[in-house]
């Protein structure tokens, strides 16, 4: 079993080491289907946030939000802007660029939009269209920390790769839609273009520095340091999740807010050495604030786990069908990951048998 408390300590130590140079740190957590990566990511996130909530309960009124008079950081200034007629055409095509659904070289583009909460934002879309959109807040709402419930301030946030599954409508437009649906979960059935763009955005926020009038000492805790270095200039970033009942992405399921100082990215292909996936590691590693974990587990242990998950999700009607789906798809994806793992020295391998 994985010691998630030890992982939490390692992540917080990285944040402590980098807090003068990086606004946030990132964690990559990779594993084959059924390896338990989602559960580990959720536990890790919960442990870190609970530790911080405990600190806040013992240190009331410690939070400060700096840089209130400065403009928000522009995270996508280099992206092409969609013109209104192009936005209308995309919406008419059910939020898709019909000629680019399989184009892994399609460059993400931006346009003005609204979040699911009807707030103004910049939407960033790629070959998956609006289903896999990243939305970045453009309205600077000043934070009144005195009105915030302490247990609502989370410094860690998970971002599953699942939200970047290409929608079923998108797969319908593939040259071979039958194979695309059958092999859903393979590398080509994710919007790797926009996930890489998300990593570029996160890297840019990671390298932001905060103006703080406080002087910290070696005895200052990491929670004390980060509590004094939140920044109003960091915009909220909304990313999609995945609805297993609907079998499609859902918009704005996760929010990486200005209080998020640790982003836990979990998924199958974040260390994959092909197409856009191969650029993710370097994009985040160049910030100097990255931890990378690969979960190793025997495939025999994952078959039953994944088969039951398929049954519960309604993808199959019997456990036998679930096992067959695992062998014909998930097992192939897991082996593909192992055969195409990027070659870097700082991947920490952990067992979850």
Curated annotation (Swiss-Prot):
The keyword Metal-binding belongs to this UniProt entry's keyword annotation: no
InterPro entries in UniProt: P-loop_NTPase
Coiled coil stretches, renumbered: none
Domain of life: Eukaryota
Similarity-based family: Belongs to the YFH7 family.
Entries under PANTHER family matching the protein: URIDINE KINASE (PTHR10285)
Protein's name according to its UniProt entry: ATP-dependent kinase YFH7
Organism, scientific name: Saccharomyces cerevisiae (strain YJM789) (Baker's yeast)
Gene assigned in the entry: YFH7
């Amino acid at each position: 079993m994985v010691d998630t408390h030890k992982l939490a300590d390692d992540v917080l130590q990285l944040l402590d080491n980098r807090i003068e140079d990086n606004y946030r740190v990132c964690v990559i957590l990779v594993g084959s289907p059924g390896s338990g990566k989602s559960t580990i990511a959720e536990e890790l996130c919960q442990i870190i946030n609970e530790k911080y909530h405990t600190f806040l309960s013992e240190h009331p009124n410690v939070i400060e939000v700096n840089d209130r008079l400065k403009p928000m950081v522009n995270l996508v200034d280099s992206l092409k802007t969609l013109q209104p007629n192009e936005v209308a055409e995309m919406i008419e095509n059910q939020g898709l660029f019909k000629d680019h659904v399989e184009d892994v070289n399609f460059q993400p583009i931006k346009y003005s939009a609204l979040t699911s909460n009807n707030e103004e934002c910049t939407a960033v879309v790629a070959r998956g269209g609006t289903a896999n959109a990243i939305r970045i807040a453009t309205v600077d709402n000043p934070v009144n920390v005195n009105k915030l419930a302490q247990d609502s301030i989370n410094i860690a946030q998970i971002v599953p790769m699942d939200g970047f599954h290409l929608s079923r409508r998108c797969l319908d437009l593939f040259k071979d839609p039958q194979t695309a649906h059958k092999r859903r979960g393979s590398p080509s059935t994710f919007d790797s273009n926009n996930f890489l763009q998300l990593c570029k955005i996160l890297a840019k926020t990671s390298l932001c520095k905060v103006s703080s009038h406080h002087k910290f000492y070696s005895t200052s805790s990491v929670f004390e340091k980060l509590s004094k270095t939140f920044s109003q200039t960091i915009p909220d970033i909304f990313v999609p999740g995945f609805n297993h009942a609907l079998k499609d992405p859902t918009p704005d399921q996760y929010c990486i807010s200005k209080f998020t100082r640790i982003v836990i990215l979990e998924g199958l292909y974040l260390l994959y050495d092909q197409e856009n996936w191969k650029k993710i590691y370097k994009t985040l590693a160049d910030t100097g604030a990255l931890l990378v974990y690969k979960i190793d587990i025997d495939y025999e242990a994952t078959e039953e786990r994944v088969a039951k998950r398929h049954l519960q999700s309604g993808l199959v009607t019997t456990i036998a069908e679930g096992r067959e789906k695992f062998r014909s798809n998930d097992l192939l994806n897991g082996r593909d990951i192992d055969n195409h793992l990027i070659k870097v020295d700082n991947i920490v391998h952990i067992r979850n048998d």
